[in-house]
Design a protein with these regions (language model features):
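Short acidic alpha-helix that forms the nucleotide-activated donor recognition element
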Residues: 49-58, 98, 113-115
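Short glycine/acidic-rich beta->alpha loop that forms part of the nucleotide-sugar donor binding site
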Residues: 69-72, 79
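A charged, aromatic-enriched C-terminal amphipathic alpha-helix characteristic of glycosyltransferases
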Residues: 126-154
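Nucleotide-activated donor-binding/catalytic signature segment of Leloir-type glycosyltransferases, i.e.
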Residues: 10-54
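Short hydrophobic beta-strand element within catalytic cores of glycosyltransferases
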Residues: 84-88
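Short glycine/serine-rich donor-binding loops of glycosyltransferases
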Residues: 72-75, 93
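Acidic donor-binding loop of glycosyltransferase active sites
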Residues: 57-70
């Protein structure tokens, strides 16, 4: 409902590609929009990893207006390609996207909040040098296991020290 009720998305002179299957009512609505605005809306219901990667590689922004997102790897992959996520500040998106640096975040699950966030992103996009800097920062994010393992090791060592001090 968030995307379908957005005033900004459907009136922008921009292109949107929707990939993957979902609830039948949303699929029908998106396919109807794609027929009405073929130069602006593309819909591909059959998801493939290859197509996802190609879309990310060619996109300037990656829309992720999740109502909830327990982890989310998609925004991390998008950042690797320099496709800046526009997402709701929830779960894994909130943990991995830095607002106005490696992507753009909004809080309320309302179309007006999504529109505001897209508008902010488009304002930043209008400055090519600043946008390139954001893309570069996003592509340099380190979500690898080596860094995570080091952080876990630090937490375990701290826990051991605390346990020793309580003896």
């Amino acid at each position: 409902d968030l995307i379908m009720n957005s005033q900004l998305i459907w009136n922008l002179d921009a292109q949107f590609v929707f990939l993957g299957a979902g609830e039948a009512r949303y699929e029908r609505a998106l396919l109807t929009l794609a027929k009405a605005r073929p130069q602006h809306v593309g819909v591909q219901l059959d998801f493939t990893d290859r197509l996802e990667h190609r879309l990310m590689a060619g996109a300037d922004m990656f829309l992720m207006p999740s109502q909830y997102e327990p982890c989310g790897l998609t925004q991390m992959r998008a950042q690797r390609y320099g496709s800046l996520p526009i997402g709701r500040r929830v779960g894994g998106i909130a943990d991995t996207v830095h607002d106005d640096t490696t992507g753009f975040l909004f809080d309320e699950f309302r179309p007006a909040a999504l529109d505001w966030c897209i508008s902010r992103a488009l304002t930043r996009f209008a400055d090519p040098d600043a946008w390139a800097m954001r893309m570069d920062t996003a592509m340099q994010q380190d979500f690898g296991w080596e860094r995570s393992a080091e952080r876990y090791a630090q937490v375990y060592l701290q826990a051991i020290e605390i346990a020793k001090s309580r003896r």
